[in-house]
Structure formats: structure tokens, C-alpha cells
């Protein structure tokens, strides 16, 4: 097991399988498509230009560089987390307020919290591989990784 020190953005702890991408994610473009709408309410990346196309982020530890795109990003994450379809945790290289707004609101409004941590170094993708078992401890500022 490898333990990484990180910056806490939103505390809490979670664990799950890593879903890793080096591409920034536009959550609005990725999630606001017909297969993710009612009644099925899935959590699949539906941006056909993204390497995670057709992958389900629910319950995964999402590891990515940053978010891009719309101010709607927070609302997309709010919807996913409040419906229990969101990722288990977010590990991001460059955090921003658009990314965490929905996560904060899901905690305040629905008492559903997911940890968000920032790990800025580019060795992130060498240290956490897709499918790794990851524990994110936002309270301690640690990411614990067991790679396959």
C-alpha cells in the first residue's frame, strides 16, 4: 500500500476502485445526455470525445486533472451525489469552485458527502492506476492506494 499526502478540499472518507483519466472532465457534456436522464438515472460518461466514454462513475474514486466547461458543473454533481449515483470520492490535480459547489450543496441540503482532495503533482497517474483500490481520507489529507 502506498500513502500519498494531499490537500483536503472537502473532508470525509471513502473507498472504491479508481477510475483514472488524464483528460479534464466536462461534467455537463459528460453527464447531461438521454441515457443519464430519468427514469434510468445512470452515471455514465456520455461525452464521446472523452476516454471514459460509456463508463459509469457511480461509487468509483474519480482521479482526473481538472474540470472544464460550464458553470452547470456543480449542479450536475449535486444531482449525481443527491441521487446516490455520484463518485465515492474525487482526487483532482487542480480544484476549482465550479467542481466542488455541487458536492458542498449535496452535503448541506441532502446530508450526502463525498471527500474531495487535491494532489497537484504529475506523478499522480504513476501512483494511482485505473482499477486500484483507493481509500481517500480527506480529514487526514491522505490517499491510500493498493495498485492491481
Residue ranges and their predicted role:
Residues 3-14, 19-144:
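Feature captures the catalytic cores and cofactor-binding loops of soluble hydro-lyases/lyases
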Residues 148:
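Active-site/ligand-binding-proximal alpha/beta "capping" segment
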Amino acid at each position: 500500500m502506498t500513502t500519498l499526502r494531499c490537500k483536503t478540499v472537502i473532508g470525509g472518507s471513502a473507498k472504491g476502485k479508481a477510475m483514472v483519466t488524464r483528460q479534464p472532465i466536462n461534467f455537463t457534456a459528460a453527464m447531461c445526455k438521454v441515457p443519464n436522464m430519468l427514469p434510468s438515472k445512470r452515471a455514465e460518461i456520455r461525452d464521446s470525445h472523452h476516454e471514459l466514454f460509456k463508463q459509469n462513475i457511480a461509487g468509483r474514486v474519480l482521479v482526473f486533472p481538472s474540470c472544464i466547461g460550464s458553470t452547470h458543473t456543480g449542479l450536475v454533481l449535486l444531482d449525481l451525489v443527491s441521487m446516490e449515483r455520484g463518485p465515492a470520492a474525487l482526487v483532482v490535480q487542480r480544484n476549482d469552485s465550479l467542481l466542488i459547489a455541487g458536492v458542498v450543496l449535496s452535503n448541506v441540503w441532502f446530508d450526502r458527502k463525498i471527500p474531495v482532495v487535491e494532489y497537484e503533482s504529475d506523478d499522480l497517474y504513476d501512483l494511482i492506476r485505473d482499477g486500484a483500490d483507493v481509500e481517500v481520507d480527506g480529514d487526514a489529507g491522505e490517499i491510500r492506494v493498493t495498485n492491481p
